[in-house]
Amino acid sequence: MRKTVEHFLAHGAKAGNMYAVGKRVCPWYAATMSVAAGMTGERTAPLVWIDEAGRSAGEWGEYWEINEKGGARMRPWFMTAAANTLYAIDRLFVADADGEIRIAFHVPEKWRAFSFTLPSEAGVTVRAEARDGRIVRLELLGSRTFGPYRLRLRTELLGDGFVRNFNILSRADERGETVLTIGALSAAEGVENLHD
């Protein structure tokens, strides 16, 4: 998949519109490339592609199939592109890949404060809050027994004492990333918290 993403990064503008007009990439394709780039482990490309998708927005924020200022314009209110872009934005915060739940993995470093509650594809809802560039609260919510799970976060997002409340089976630090393997949790345990 990495070669496909790299090829599209290099050549997408040549054939990336919905129709053979214009000079940019259609927002649906751009959002799809954001997700694909994230799945390959790219850190910055997902946001670049989300920004590209956003370039097609009109005066009211509506997405177009093609909306190039001073150039080609086709079909406003392209809702599948808008939904695909929303999905790509969600995956900046919570993305399941390679048997892991990646938490805030693609959030830009300049975003120093954020919070979210989003479902993961693994059946767990992830709730997190960051302040001053550090995650200060992380909750996993499930309606059934779940786990064990591997969570991957950028190490710089973790504060001291961040992991004390989970049943941590293992912790590995690799290339600026921290991987936590968390033991099984039951619905009866409710919410498990990580606090800084």
Region annotations inferred by a language model:
Residues A97, L157, F162, E174-G176:
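Repetitive beta-strand solenoid architecture
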Residues P76-R127, R131:
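Catalytic cores of secreted or luminal carbohydrate-active enzymes
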Residues K110-R112, A122, R134, T145, ...:
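Residues that act as N-cap/strand-start positions at coil-to-secondary-structure junctions
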Residues M1-E100, V136:
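Active-site core of glycosidic bond-cleaving carbohydrate-active enzymes
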Residues I103-F105, L140-L157:
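Surface-exposed beta-strand/loop patches in extracellular or lumenal glycoproteins
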Residues L151-L169:
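Solvent-exposed beta-hairpin/edge-strand motifs
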Residues N167-D196:
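C-terminal beta-strand-rich structural cap/linker in extracellular carbohydrate-active enzymes
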Residues A122-Y149:
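Carbohydrate-binding surface patches
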